Curated annotation (Swiss-Prot):
Belongs to the SEC61-beta family. It comes from the Archaea. GO terms for biological process: protein transport. This is Preprotein translocase subunit SecG. Keywords: Cell membrane, Membrane, Protein transport, Translocation, Transmembrane, Transmembrane helix, Transport. The chain crosses the membrane at residues 34-53. Component of the protein translocase complex. Heterotrimer consisting of alpha (SecY), beta (SecG) and gamma (SecE) subunits. Can form oligomers of the heterotrimer. Pfam families: Sec61_beta (PF03911). Its main location: membrane.
Length: 55
């Protein structure tokens, strides 16, 4: 009886399988800090505004 209970606990629920798979894939990608993304977008915006004012 305990072995069947153990098997039920180790098998993931079908609705959770996608979340677990997504979490595993996330570790393989390059991580960029949100501060860097915001800073880069602000810098690009300022550069575009300055260039349009000059020309």
């Amino acid at each position: 009886m305990p072995s069947s209970k153990k098997k039920k606990e180790t098998v993931p629920v079908m609705s959770m399988a996608g979340l677990i798979r997504y979490y595993e894939e996330e570790n393989e990608k390059v991580k960029i800090s949100p501060k860097i993304v915001i800073g880069a977008s602000l810098a690009l915006t300022i550069i575009v505004i300055v260039i349009t004012k000059l020309f």
